């Protein structure tokens, strides 16, 4: 989201943030020696070269990643960074720092920075326009050489996987792998081992099969998710009831049951932004709620200078005194 366009590095500790790349992805034991492709991330790395999203930052891409670290693989932009954005809270494009450029100019700037591929763009038109911009600046020969440089990196990965030498599917081999009962059992066993039992002091588990079980439904309040989609209030089954019926006898009331099977989710406090708050004269920012029920930010800072988006005319994003109620607050009532 545009509300989180900036990354800051207190204490000038940018080197620590680079370690996953320099000590991890760029130093692998496999035959490629480094990750085949890398995404640089959406944010503006404040103070590290030009204050633009990493995919447009020539200092980070060409000087640091390509130069200092010697990275030779594909660099793909994060999803949708060349698209337009109209609001800090809508899930749209992420052209952070280059909002004033056209879509074609953004593509060209990313190419100049050293990017090879555009994530989330299936339209060749702005890429071709970017090519024309490059020809006007560096000539046909220079821009073609730049495109071929990226083409070599992209095609190298395709050749490495054998997609040119043998692009055909071996049906016999596929039928032995897809839906393989041994593989499915291994996957199911792994899921069982991943389940964490917090307590079983009275030895209630495991349960005998075919006991009577009460399974309450979950109520979901109306909300707007991070895609901007508004959902209506609804009551849903917490589990696949057909599967539950294979093991237990499902009853309609708690009084009929030997035990209850209650499914809940972690508190869902929304997306920390409320358009209705903005409409009422607020700044739109609301607190994160990590508890069931209502949380009021009584002790938050009066001033939070985290603004800077060209889509906002203020810098103070404080949400002190504002309240947020979790969407699934009734989950705790079920328990």
Predicted regions and their residues:
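Glycoside hydrolase catalytic-domain context in secreted enzymes
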Residues: 1-335
């Amino acid at each position: 989201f545009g509300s989180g366009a900036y990354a800051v590095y207190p204490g000038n500790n940018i080197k620590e943030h680079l370690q996953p790349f320099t000590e991890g992805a760029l130093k692998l034991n496999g035959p490629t020696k480094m990750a085949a492709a890398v995404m640089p991330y959406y944010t503006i790395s404040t103070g590290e070269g030009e204050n633009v999203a990493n995919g447009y930052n020539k200092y980070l891409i060409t000087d640091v990643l390509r130069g200092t670290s010697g990275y030779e693989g594909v660099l793909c932009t994060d999803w949708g960074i060349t698209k337009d954005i109209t609001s800090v809270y809508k899930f749209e494009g992420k052209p952070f720092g280059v909002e004033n450029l056209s879509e074609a100019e953004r593509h060209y700037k990313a190419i100049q920075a050293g990017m090879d591929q555009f994530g989330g763009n299936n339209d060749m038109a702005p890429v071709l326009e970017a090519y024309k911009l490059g020809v006007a600046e560096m000539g046909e020969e220079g821009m073609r050489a730049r495109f071929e440089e990226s083409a070599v990196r992209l095609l190298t990965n395709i050749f490495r996987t054998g997609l040119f030498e043998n692009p055909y599917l071996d049906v016999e081999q596929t039928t032995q792998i897809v839906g393989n009962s041994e593989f499915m059992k291994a996957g199911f066993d792994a899921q069982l081992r991943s389940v964490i039992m917090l307590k079983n002091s009275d030895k209630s588990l495991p349960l005998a099969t075919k006991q009577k079980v009460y399974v309450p439904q979950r109520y979901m309040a109306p909300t707007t998710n991070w895609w901007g989609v508004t959902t209506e209030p609804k009551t849903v089954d917490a589990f696949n009831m057909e599967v539950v019926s294979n093991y237990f006898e499902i009853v309609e009331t708690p009084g009929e049951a030997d035990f209850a099977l209650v499914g809940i989710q972690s508190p869902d406090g929304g997306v920390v932004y409320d358009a209705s708050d903005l409409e009422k004269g607020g700044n739109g920012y609301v607190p994160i709620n990590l508890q069931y029920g209502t949380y009021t930010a009584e002790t938050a800072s009066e001033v939070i200078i985290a603004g800077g988006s060209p889509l906002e005319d203020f810098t103070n994003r404080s949400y002190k005194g504002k309240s947020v109620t979790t969407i699934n607050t009734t989950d705790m009532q079920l328990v």
